[in-house]
Curated annotation (Swiss-Prot):
Homodimer; parallel. This is Cortexillin-2. It comes from Heterostelium pallidum (strain ATCC 26659 / Pp 5 / PN500) (Cellular slime mold). One of its GO terms (cellular component) is cytoskeleton. Its main location: cytoplasm. It is found in: Cytoplasm, Cytoskeleton. CDD domains: CH_CTX_rpt1. The gene is ctxB. Residues 1-231 are annotated as: Actin-binding. Actin-bundling protein. When linked to F-actin the actin filaments form preferentially anti-parallel bundles that associate into meshworks. Plays a major role in cytokinesis. GO terms for molecular function: actin binding.
Length: 449
């Protein structure tokens, strides 16, 4: 292992032990650790640390006093699952056995991953975060200090001016920054480390000579510098808390003064108490009355809801009946339409029958008149032939009209036709007879011998 790696490992051990202890101290009731490679091997303190640093409750039950290797591995396995599944932190190649076997390299790698997530990744300055955000924060914080030029972690911190400026900016009353301008790099670095340890509570993680020569791993510089950032943030939080406490104290003092100035006599307080008690009694009475009204209203609502349910059932029944009625109505309308069509057909037929009857009546009248004339003419001929000197007959015999009046149209027509035919036959016979008589009268009689 190279000296650089050894230095980096030493820095990590000190930094991570300090970080873990600061987290466990806030939790309370947990003994501090001194060696990260051995004091986390049973998984108990590691689980407490993970809960506190993440703010999440450990979801599984674990053994608080694991006596055997298997029980310690079980605890650590649950811790690894918690990191992976709940904290969403991916740690490659680190298993529970690494902690049980005190594999310092793997344990430090595991803690470095957690440190980057919870202590470096949370650093933001402007539009930059993590390492870039940390570098931007240092540049902003040390702005205006002579001899400070922040460009990167590898070269910008070797002369000690950056760390001196950070320590001075934190508390300018401790020392004067300019008094170290003539000192060499190692002196400035050692002074900065001393001021940081005493004023900011930052442990001496780096070796001044190694840092001045550029023999310190960049990750060690980032880790040490991040402690300044969190010291500043802790100071800001303390100042904000103190300001809040002072504000609260001022408000309490003002309130006490107001109360002192507004004290009233015991009689006034007693009177106010009595009034309040009476008001309270009235309020309780009103509450009881209101509760009773609410109960009555609720009862009415329940009745109304039951009525609504009944109405719904009645509505469904009515809708069912209406549906059947609509069907019946459609059938009746169809039958009505058919009936109306039939009535129309019958009216038309009646009209036609009326017209036909009128025509038949008119024809019958004409036929009766015509037949009557014929009968009259026949009667005239009969009368004339019987008595040529007699007045011509002009009236249809009465017995014929009476006979026809009692018959239907077809019977009248048939009777008249038969009558005319009979009259014609009678007339022909009569004429034949007369003709024979005339012939007989005109022929010479035979002489008798």
């Amino acid at each position: 292992m190279t000296d650089l790696h050894k230095e980096w490992e030493k820095v990590q051990e000190m930094a991570f032990a300090s970080w873990v202890n600061s987290v466990l101290e806030k939790r309370g009731g947990v003994e501090k650790i001194s060696d990260v490679s051995t004091d986390l091997s049973d998984g108990v303190k590691l689980i407490f640390f993970l809960e506190s640093v993440s703010g999440k409750k450990f979801p599984k039950k674990f053994d608080l006093e694991p006596k055997t290797r298997i029980l310690r591995i079980q605890n650590l396995h649950l811790a690894m699952l918690f990191v992976d599944e709940d904290l969403k932190v991916k740690v490659q190649g680190v298993a529970a056995e690494e902690f049980v076997d005190n594999n310092k390299k793997m344990i430090l790698g595991f803690l470095w991953t957690l440190y980057r997530k919870y202590r470096i990744s949370v650093i933001n300055e402007g539009d930059k975060s993590s390492e870039e955000g940390l570098l931007a924060w240092v540049k902003k914080t040390t702005d205006g200090y002579s001899g400070v030029n922040i460009t990167n972690f590898k070269a910008s911190f070797r002369d000690g001016n950056a760390y001196l400026a950070l320590a001075h900016k934190f508390d300018p009353s401790v020392f004067k920054y300019d008094e170290f301008s003539g000192k060499d790099q190692i002196e400035r670095l050692n002074a900065a480390f001393d001021f940081a340890e005493k004023g900011l509570g930052i442990p001496k993680l780096l070796d001044a000579e190694s840092l001045s020569k550029g023999n310190v791993d960049e990750r060690s510089i980032i880790l040490y510098t991040s402690l300044f950032f969190h010291a500043y943030r802790a100071k800001e939080e303390r100042e904000a808390l103190e300001a809040s406490q002072n504000s609260l104290a001022n408000k309490l003092a003002s309130l006490e003064q107001s109360l002192e100035g507004e004290k009233t006599s015991q009689d006034e307080l007693a009177r106010q108490k009595k009034e309040l008690e009476e008001s309270l009694r009235l309020i309780r009475q009103q509450n009881e009355q209101r509760n009773q009204r609410i109960a009555d209203i609720q009862s009415k609502i329940d009745d109304a809801l039951r009525g609504i349910d009944d109405e719904k059932m009645a509505k469904l029944d009515l809708e069912s009946r209406l549906s059947k009625t609509e069907k019946d109505k459609a059938i009746l309308e169809l039958k009505l339409a058919e009936t109306l069509d039939e009535n129309e057909r019958l009216r038309n037929k009646i009209e036609e029958d009326k017209k036909r009857a009128a025509a038949e009546a008119e024809g019958l009248g004409l036929l009766r008149t015509h037949i009557g004339h014929q009968i009259t003419d026949i009667a005239k001929w009969q009368s004339f032939l019987d008595n040529p000197e007699a007045v011509p007959y002009t009236k249809t015999p009465v017995n014929l009209e009476a006979e026809l009046a009692s018959l239907q149209f077809e019977e009248q027509a048939k009777r008249l036709g038969s009558k005319v035919e009979n009259e014609n036959i009678s007339l022909e016979k009569y004429l034949s007879l007369k003709e024979e008589e005339l012939k007989s009268a005109g022929a010479p009689k035979k002489r008798t011998k």
